[in-house]
Amino acid sequence: MKARARNIALKVAYDGTNYHGFQRQTAPVIAVQNVLERALAKVCGEQVELAAAGRTDAGVHAYGQVVNFFTDGRIPVARLPRAVNGLLPPDIVVTEAWEAARDFSARHSATGKTYVYRIEQCTVPNPFTRSYVWQIFQPLDHDAMRAVLALLVGTHDYSSFRAAGGAPMSPVRTLDEIRLTEEGAGRLSCHLHGNGFLYHMVRNIMSAMVSVGLGRISTDRFAEIFAARDRRLVPPTAPACGLYLLSVDYAEVPQ
């Protein structure tokens, strides 16, 4: 079969609330990939198959997901975002498009990713933010939380924070930045940048961090849990709704 002429990359933002993650699902379950591929097929005049930088879970959001696909469609790349967005629901938006090199892969060419996790400290539930933050109803010790996050910076074995029964891959990753920011009105954002992340890694780190902030786990105990490389010692995974894929790094791709 003849290779398709163009490799097109897209940057995509989406609200993951109503989708069963990014990765294509079988009807009646709908994922972001299902919706995006259907719209692209209409614009390109042929079926396309997306490769994505990250397979976000159900309820997880993205500001800067990156995908690529091969096509013989002739639409100018500058017109592609507007054409596709006209066919997409309002909770999925193509923000950029560019012609990529044939060997570019949104997944395999990535050199790093940035995630942000959002927390809101509330006295009562907030119905307007419940799908976009982890709502916490007790005071949090921000200094203690920052102290344990600092332990995670560097190249480490993150087995304690991987998904239970996760795929057999190396648990060693490098996190070169973890930053907890107070945004006012009881809102916190935690930015994490690294060369890669294990499945559920960010959400499990957030779960343990919040347990420290609530005084349920001491800073010393957090360090012991991290060193133990045992997922069973970490509290249940934090909610998906607070997690956002912020951006993906590439060596030679415009950002």
What is each PLM-predicted segment?
Residues 1-255:
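Structured-RNA-binding interfaces characteristic of tRNA pseudouridine synthases
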